[in-house]
């Protein structure tokens, strides 16, 4: 009897005569369907047992064989990092083992300050370095957005200007040596940047995953590419919201570069940074040492979190 396809609801039992119990890295994620690559470069279609969905692009995993082309993911290996978002209803894993988040923005379509700030918070919470990419920098509409991004440079986040179709190579020095992920709203040019950086590699990887992704040109699932032996790049789907329900309200100030030095300086240890006397955060906002808008953002996120 032919083996059951691993992308059906049932998971086939590996042939006990098979000896492979190897490791691999997830290079593409499609819900409960994955593409994994072993250290020798062999690529397999992969599924999970018991409908597990707690795997992410970039995960290093243990695999067991199904046949010459298909494997089952048994578990993930210890992660260096995990980037994800969570709202009141669900959790969405974005990528694992990334060391640098590149938030791709552009003046057109209208950029979201809300999304930018939330993504920066998520990176801080996950211990991931963050870089802001100002794409389509040659557009006349860019001037105002460029000015707004200067504030984030003062917080320590580099801003790199690119024109994806002309000088995507300006990103290479920042990418080198990192496991990178491009994240941002739809239409900001993430996939165009990826194609410019990867060239023919994109087409080869697309051949592998085309059957799973319905041949769409718009990125619908995260995909990992190698830039070189030391550098990886994940292109992720566009998003409009970034839920932060996985964060703890008490930890939030430490994720704000402009407020973390004030932690512990309020008169009351349980200060909410609103009406309490002796609040160091309010004092900083009132004197101009910190942005009132950023304090309002901190308060808003605190109100949003459960508990």
From Swiss-Prot:
EC main group: hydrolase
Q: How is the cofactor bound?
A: Binds 1 zinc ion per subunit.
Molecular function terms in GO for this entry? GTP binding; GTPase activity; metal ion binding; rRNA binding
InterPro entries given in the database record: G_CP_dom, P-loop_NTPase, Ribosome_biogen_GTPase_RsgA, RsgA_GTPase_dom
**Record: residues binding GTP:** 135-138, 184-192
Positions of the UniProt region annotated as Disordered: 1-21
Tell me where in or outside the cell this protein is found.
Cytoplasm
Describe the subunit structure: Monomer. Associates with 30S ribosomal subunit, binds 16S rRNA.
User: HAMAP family attached here?
Assistant: GTPase_RsgA (MF_01820)
Family listed: Belongs to the TRAFAC class YlqF/YawG GTPase family. RsgA subfamily.
Q: What is the protein's known function?
A: One of several proteins that assist in the late maturation steps of the functional core of the 30S ribosomal subunit. Helps release RbfA from mature subunits. May play a role in the assembly of ribosomal proteins into the subunit. Circularly permuted GTPase that catalyzes slow GTP hydrolysis, GTPase activity is stimulated by the 30S ribosomal subunit.
Query: What protein is this chain from?
Result: Small ribosomal subunit biogenesis GTPase RsgA
> What species is this protein from?
Neisseria meningitidis serogroup B (strain ATCC BAA-335 / MC58)
């Amino acid at each position: 009897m032919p083996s059951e396809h691993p992308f059906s609801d049932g998971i086939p039992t590996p042939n006990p005569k098979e000896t492979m119990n190897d490791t691999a890295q997830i290079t593409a994620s499609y819900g409960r369907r994955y593409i994994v690559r072993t250290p020798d470069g062999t690529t397999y279609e992969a599924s999970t047992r018991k409908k597990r969905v707690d795997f992410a692009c970039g995960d290093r995993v243990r695999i067991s064989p199904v046949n010459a082309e298909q494997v089952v993911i048994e578990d993930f290996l210890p992660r260096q990092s995990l980037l994800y978002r969570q709202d009141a209803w669900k959790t969405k894993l974005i990528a694992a083992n990334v060391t640098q988040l590149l938030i791709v923005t552009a003046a057109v379509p209208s950029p979201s300050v809300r999304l930018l700030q939330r993504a920066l918070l998520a990176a801080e919470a996950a211990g991931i370095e963050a870089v802001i990419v100002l794409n389509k920098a040659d557009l006349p509409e860019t001037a105002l957005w460029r000015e707004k991004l200067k504030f984030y440079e003062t917080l320590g986040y580099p801003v790199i200007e690119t024109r994806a179709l002309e000088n995507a190579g300006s990103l290479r020095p920042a990418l080198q040596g990192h496991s990178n992920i491009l994240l941002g709203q739809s239409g900001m040019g993430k996939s165009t940047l990826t194609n410019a950086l990867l060239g023919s590699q994109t087409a080869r990887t697309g051949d592998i995953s085309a059957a799973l992704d319905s041949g769409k040109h718009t990125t619908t699932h995260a995909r990992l590419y190698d830039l070189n032996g030391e550098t990886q790049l994940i292109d992720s789907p566009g998003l409009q919201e970034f839920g932060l329900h996985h964060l703890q309200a008490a930890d939030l100030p430490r994720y704000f570069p402009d407020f973390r030095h004030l932690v512990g300086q309020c008169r009351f240890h349980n200060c909410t940074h609103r009406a309490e006397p002796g609040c160091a955060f309010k004092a900083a906002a009132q004197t101009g040492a910190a942005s009132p808008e950023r304090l309002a953002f901190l308060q808003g996120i605190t109100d949003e979190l459960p508990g």
